[in-house]
Structure formats: C-alpha cells, structure tokens
Amino acid sequence: MTNRQRPTRILAFDISGSPGFAVVEYAEGKRPKLVHATSIKTDSKRTDAERYAYIEATAAKLIYEYGPFDVVCREHFVGGRNKRASQTVFGAWAAIDLALGRFGYTIDKADEFTPAAVKKAATGSGKADKLEVEAGVRKRLVLPDDYVFTADDQSDAVAVALAWIDSNTTK
C-alpha cells in the first residue's frame, strides 16, 4: 500500500465589488491544478446590501460545493481610488468573511498577499499588467493558450493561490 500525500486544497479570492474565486490543488513537487475559477459581476445600481448578499451567497455556494479547504487566502487590499471604492471592497470583504465564518473558516494575516506578490507569483514581475497575469497563470498551470478566463478577477484569484504556494513551499 502506497502512502500518497493528499494535495493541499486552496480557496483564493480576489475581492472587489465583482470578486474572483479560485480553487487550486497543490502537492509538493507537482504542478498546481486548477479545480475551479469563477467570478461574479454585481450591479452597481443595486443597493450595497443586495450586492453584498449576492457576494456572500456566491462564496457560500463555492465553499459548500468545493470544500473542504486546507488554506483560504486573498489579495491584501491596499486602498481604493476613492472613499466609495474602498467602501465597496471592504463590504465585499466582510460578505466573504461572513460566508467563510458560516463554514468555520478564517483568513490568517499570513495568507494575505500584496498585489505585487500576486503579480510576481504569476509572471515573475511585481509590476505585471492584467493580461500578463492571465498569461502567466495559464503558463504556470499549463493551461492551453486558448483557455480563457472570462474576467480578470478569475485569473487574479488563481494568482493569489499561486502566491500562497510560492510562500509556503520549499523551492
């Protein structure tokens, strides 16, 4: 009987008013595997309460369908363009934290990554643009060149998972 190590299952978020979600599996010495990536677009014409409820429900559905998780991580929010943009992100952040809490999960400070660290994980450069991040994620996961993330938020969430892998594995 072989003793096979179970892969680490990572749930990663790119949190905004239109958040990205990714589920990635990783086993030491193996290539990370994309299990699921999605994002949602909230309607800015809706009330904040409606938008945050939708974000929370989507996160809860994802946690229910793809859990259990060994790690939950997110991109660290460093400030919005203005007060309203910051409020939107913090509201989405709280909505996701509510969903996580319902299933017994939290996000440790050590599992939050700066935008530069996320970009570097995907591309090798902390100054990459969105298209470079998407291409880097495809390359790192060996996804076909024609694999399309339907929103930047999806590839960004995958890049967050890659940042966690890079910071928690031996090279």
Predicted segments, located by residue:
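Phosphate- and other anionic-substrate recognition elements at nucleic-acid/protein interfaces
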Residues: 1-171
